[in-house]
Amino acid sequence: KDASRSVVVVIDVLRATSTIVTALASGCEEVIPAESIEEAIALANGYKRSDYVLGGERRGVPVEGFDLGNSPQEYDGPRVAGKKIIIATTNGTNAITEYGVARDIFVACFLNADAVMEACRAYKDSDFVLVCSGQDGRFCMEDTLCAGLLATRLAEETGAEMSDAARVASLLYQQRKESIEDELLRCDHGAYLVGIGYEQDVR
């Protein structure tokens, strides 16, 4: 698809898009995604220190010297209210910046699926591209399940036609929708996060 004519929805359930959604719900001024740690630092240097919070991770671990990591729990509260959030993550922020030419771009997770659908319903003349950020370039269960939820609803509510990949994601979601939390805990990335102490981000 030509991304410049499409509405792109980037999904990184564990954890970038969940973190971004949480930060916005907590009243941050804006979220600025960065492709790399170096770019995040360069972006931060363009603002007064009191105006931003610098967040990021590599391999799930907070970046040394940054204010916050990539746990949604860290962005739920007054620390981010009124601040610019500059964030660089292993998977999600790269996917967001890659599709910057899109007609419009949204970030999605299970937390904001209803809001994303409400926004998408205004674009009935557009193609929708669901981007699963994955894990280090690999397939991941959690993003595919969320994509399946959105693909199902887009087909039902906007009449969008599914690609084969979207259809597979939809079928997977239909099969597993009653056990999403269990699937998140069992999937590769979820299990990895639990193993390094971030079980609260998975549940």
Model regions and ranges:
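Glycine-rich anion-binding loop/nest that anchors nucleotide
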Residues: 129-135, 158-161
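A short alpha/beta connector and helix-capping loop motif
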Residues: 19-38, 48-53, 58
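Gly/His-enriched, cation/cofactor- and phosphate-binding structural elements
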Residues: 130, 140-141
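Fold-independent oxyanion-binding glycine-rich loops
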Residues: 11-14, 34-37, 56-59, 66-71, ...
